[in-house]
């Protein structure tokens, strides 16, 4: 449990994928599988904490999340929406179940990614992108819909601005339908099955499971056994040193020590 509102399973860099570079530029994937929270007058979540050197990407599948940060950004995302926070040089933030959702209770399902920043951008100015479902790029095909959050597919671009080449899609497949995705062979690619069960290259992958691909081809065929949703991640590796310490993701221990010092000296701003 992260805080008291995010009941998560970590797929990487823990579990069976301990190599911190294996899904670069994606460093971490925490998945809050569907879980029913009872009504509460207190908003569950994660209180104020710092980040530096990367981006947090929260994707809502069920439930609502409220965000506040020390750069003055705030917002609420619901089903199908995304918040993309660039911590970069340093920010404080907090994430909670949205007030009305907390009071009524309901099923909560989310993904949070940590996307590493190239060394040259780690100390850039923090920013916040709130991406509503209706603003995402859409590739409709006979068997369903591909929503492009970041990157592009067949010249359809996603709205998220990124610092390195990467793709983040939500793939929705109708029962017994399939799609063959064309993705760069040199990109690190993985897929999380959010709903339903699918065969990926003839291997069965059930809901709440993650499929990691070898970098040896450009075509991946996914076929739904039932109505299915998948999160597709594909990105060009950064091939830079990674040093992770708590909420900081840098390129050296000296930079980590500086991040800790700057945080302790109040340089990440103020957030109540």
Q: What is the meaning of each model-derived region?
A:
Residues 1-272:
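Jelly-roll (double-stranded beta-helix
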């Amino acid at each position: 449990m992260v805080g008291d509102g995010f009941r998560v399973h970590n797929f990487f860099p823990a579990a069976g994928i301990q190599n911190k570079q294996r899904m670069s530029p994606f460093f971490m994937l925490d998945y809050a599988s569907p879980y029913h929270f009872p009504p509460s007058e207190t908003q569950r979540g994660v209180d104020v904490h710092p980040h530096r050197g990367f981006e947090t990407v929260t994707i809502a599948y069920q439930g609502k999340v409220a965000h506040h940060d020390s750069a003055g950004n705030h917002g609420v995302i619901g089903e199908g929406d995304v918040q993309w926070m660039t911590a970069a040089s340093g920010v404080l933030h907090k994430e909670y179940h949205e007030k009305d959702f907390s009071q009524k209770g309901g099923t909560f399902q989310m993904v949070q990614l940590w996307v590493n920043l190239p060394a040259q951008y780690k100390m850039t100015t923090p920013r916040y992108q709130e991406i509503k479902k209706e603003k995402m790029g859409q590739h409709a095909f006979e068997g369903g819909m591909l929503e492009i959050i970041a990157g592009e597919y067949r010249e359809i671009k996603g709205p998220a601005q990124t610092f390195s080449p990467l793709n983040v899609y939500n793939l929705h497949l109708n029962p017994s339908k399939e799609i063959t995705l064309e993705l760069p062979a040199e990109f690190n690619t993985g897929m999380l099955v959010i709903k339903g069960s699918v065969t990926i290259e003839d291997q069965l992958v059930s809901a709440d499971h993650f499929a990691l691909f070898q970098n040896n081809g450009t075509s991946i065929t996914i076929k739904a056994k039932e109505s299915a949703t998948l999160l597709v991640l594909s990105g060009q590796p950064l091939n830079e040193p990674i040093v992770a310490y708590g909420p900081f993701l840098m390129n050296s221990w000296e930079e980590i020590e500086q991040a800790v010092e700057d945080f302790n000296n109040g340089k990440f701003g103020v957030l109540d």
